């Protein structure tokens, strides 16, 4: 379902995106090409001056919440996966090719390209450079913690690419099903 926010801003969604009927998208939200937004995802740019931009070929899986504080922006780079039940809260920038795992929380930070934030991790008030791995359950809230992060491995990169491929397949499949109805 799509709603305008109190400032009367409407979501702008690419015609090639697939949005579940149970997803809720509110306000100044831009969704790019071939994006998959799964069941019960909530994407809210309803606080004054907040905006959310989701790049091309992204997936926003079941029960994900994306929200921005007043006068903040959430930017999700192309080819990024937001896995089941994670929270991305603005102000926040996620670079291209990132993966945010199940139940992870990302708030008030800048995440570079090709990062893997694993399940139930918390990342807050830090800048993470390109190509790092935040381990399962890690709490990264000080810049000094970032120096301890491992580099992305080829296996990690392959995993991220496989998630994107599966979700692009879902966009195509669900789009084709909706044309049959």
Region locations from a protein language model:
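Extended, small-residue-rich solenoid/repeat segments and analogous flexible loops
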Residues: 1-36, 42, 48
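Conserved SET/PR domain catalytic loop and adjacent active-site segment
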Residues: 39-40, 131
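Glycine/small-residue-rich loop that forms an oxyanion/phosphate-binding "nest" at active or ligand-binding sites
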Residues: 77
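A cytosolic small-molecule/anion-sensing beta-strand core signal
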Residues: 56
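Glycine/small-residue-rich phosphate/adenosyl-binding loop
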Residues: 59
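Glycine-rich hexapeptide-repeat left-handed beta-helix
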Residues: 2-12, 46, 51-53, 62-63, ...
């Amino acid at each position: 379902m799509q709603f305008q926010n109190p400032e009367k801003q409407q979501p702008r969604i690419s015609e090639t995106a697939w949005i579940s009927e149970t997803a809720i998208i509110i306000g100044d939200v831009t969704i790019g090409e071939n994006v998959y937004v799964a069941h019960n995802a909530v994407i809210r740019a309803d606080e004054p001056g907040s905006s959310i931009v989701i790049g091309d070929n992204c997936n926003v899986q079941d029960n994900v919440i994306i929200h921005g504080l007043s006068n903040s922006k959430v930017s999700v780079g192309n080819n990024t996966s937001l896995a089941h039940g994670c929270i991305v809260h603005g102000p926040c920038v996620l670079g291209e090719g990132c993966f945010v795992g199940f139940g992870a929380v990302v708030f008030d930070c800048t995440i570079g390209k090709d990062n893997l934030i694993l399940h139930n991790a918390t990342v807050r008030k830090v800048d993470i450079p390109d190509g790092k791995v935040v381990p399962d359950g890690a709490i990264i809230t000080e810049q000094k913690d970032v120096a301890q992060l491992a580099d992305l491995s080829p296996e990690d990169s392959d995993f991220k690419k496989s998630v994107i491929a599966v979700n692009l397949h879902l966009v195509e499949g669900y789009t084709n099903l909706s044309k049959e109805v």
